[in-house]
């Protein structure tokens, strides 16, 4: 999407905004994550400043890529290694359960957990801890992986992250609404606020996830 108002100076404002928000955490993250955030800010700038550009779907698509990139770096790589080392030659029974299938795909195909899968998965693990609900094999391995890592225990199961993920999931911006013909301004603002705290609130989803890998 071309823009007459998005120039080099405006881009540097966005770059500095992102750098100031994430600080030294950016040094530990893939450059592609940074690039996705810059592109999302470019599209957000166009959406909020130019007439005739009313569709927020491109922004949500780029933020989804940023999420996938971050989750792969913070969760997928570490969990897959842990699960494969743990399983060795063992082949746990498979169940026709969406979350269990998602974890199997992570371990066997390096798939990434979507926002729609991560939220109920963490809720299931919380229910297991608080109410003794039995977990399916791969979900149990995921729960053990969290317990094995102090940073995961502290951040991935934190109440602030849980609340933000639940709100994002309930908004369906990255689910059913994403498959509509367009996303409106208010929905984009809500997604940006939850994922990035509008680059002001340190309790955003992306920031809380980034802290896991520090």
Regions found by a protein language model. Name each.
Residues 39, 79-87, 193-203:
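Amphipathic alpha-helical scaffolding segments
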Residues 139-214:
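Charge-enriched, short contiguous segments at helix-coil
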Residues 1-58, 78, 90:
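Charged alpha-helical initiation segments
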Residues 48, 70-82, 185, 210-213:
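Long, hydrophobic, amphipathic alpha-helical segments used as structural scaffolds
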Residues 5-17, 24, 28-31, 35, ...:
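Alpha-helix boundary/N-cap detector
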Residues 51-53, 57-58, 62, 73-83, ...:
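Structured extramembrane domains adjacent to transmembrane segments
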Residues 59-77, 115-129:
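Hydrophobic alpha-helical packing segments in soluble, helical-rich domains
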Residues 86-165:
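Flexible secondary-structure boundary motifs
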């Amino acid at each position: 999407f071309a823009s007459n108002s998005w120039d080099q100076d405006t881009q540097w404002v966005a770059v500095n905004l992102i750098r100031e928000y994430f600080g030294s955490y950016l040094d530990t993250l893939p450059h592609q994550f940074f690039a996705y955030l810059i592109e999302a800010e470019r599209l957000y700038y166009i959406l909020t400043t130019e007439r005739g550009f009313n569709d927020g779907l491109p922004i949500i698509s780029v933020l989804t890529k940023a999420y996938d990139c971050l989750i792969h770096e913070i969760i997928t790589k570490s969990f897959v290694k842990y699960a494969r080392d743990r399983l060795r030659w063992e082949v746990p029974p498979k169940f026709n359960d969406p979350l269990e299938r998602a974890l199997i795909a992570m371990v066997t195909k390096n798939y990434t957990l979507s926002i729609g899968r991560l939220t109920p998965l963490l809720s299931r693990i919380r229910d297991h801890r608080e109410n003794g609900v039995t977990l399916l094999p791969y979900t149990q391995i995921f729960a053990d992986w969290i317990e094995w890592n102090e940073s995961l225990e502290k951040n991935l199961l934190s109440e602030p992250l849980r609340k933000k993920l639940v709100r994002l999931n309930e908004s369906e911006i990255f689910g059913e609404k994403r498959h509509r013909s367009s996303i409106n301004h208010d929905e984009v603002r809500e997604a940006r606020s939850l994922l990035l705290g509008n680059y002001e609130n340190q309790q955003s989803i992306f920031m809380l996830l980034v802290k896991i890998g520090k």
